[in-house]
Amino acid sequence: MNMQRILVYSDKGVSPYYLRHTVRWLKQAAFPFQMEVCRVNGQFLIHEPLWEETTQLLVIPGGADVPYHHVLHGLGTARIDNYVREGGAYLGICAGAYFGCAHFSFLEPNGSLLVAKRDLGFFPGMANGPAYDSAFSYTSSSGVLAASLRFTDFPGKSFALFNGGCYFENAEDFSEVRVEARYNDLPGSPAAIISRRLDRGLVVLSGPHIEYLPEFCSLQEENVVHAREQIAKNSAGLEEYKQTLIKRLLSNVVEHVLY
């Protein structure tokens, strides 16, 4: 099959800012693979015939999970689950990671606690967020910081942008789940990025915004400038991880069986 596309979800709830970073990073990273990066909405994933046959990777970027659920719950998530199990790859970043978990709890900016179940359940446990006690907001960058990460396969200090993402509770207790990175500066160093082989497919869920490219960030809020500088100076481990990650995601099993 001719699988030469990366689909990036772009519908209600997706942050335009993080969508731009996601698409820019994917276009750079996927260039050697000669794959097209396409933005798609929920109706496409629900109704477009046979998109699975030409798609190597589906990316659900940052934003707000609840609108994702409203649009994709049912037929959309069923097709995504089948796509992955039949050999596809799924990358969920921040809200896309919450969306890929069986359960999550999220402290909303107004102080209310959202506890919810989700269809995909790629991570079978609970995702909790925001992982850091920062002033998260859906409408500003007030909660942005540089998260200190410790990668399983890449030693050394590294930072990634954080803005409301989760940690994966007791991820090490699930034998089918691999912890790819931990929050180095949180109590107990909980899992920040996890992966899982699901039948013939591959899932990667990331609490922090690993797609963020500091050289393309012009925001001038003090906390964002500080985070950007930290990430730019301490990104060797993150960059190594991202290079390996994209190869894994784009080199996964390419044969899909559609029923």
UniProtKB/Swiss-Prot annotation:
Highest taxon above the source species: Bacteria
Signal peptide per UniProt: none
Transmembrane parts of this sequence: none
Pfam families in UniProt: BPL_N (PF09825)
Family according to the record: Belongs to the chlamydial CPn_0128/CT_035/TC_0305 family.
Name of this chain's protein: Uncharacterized protein TC_0305
Organism name: Chlamydia muridarum (strain MoPn / Nigg)
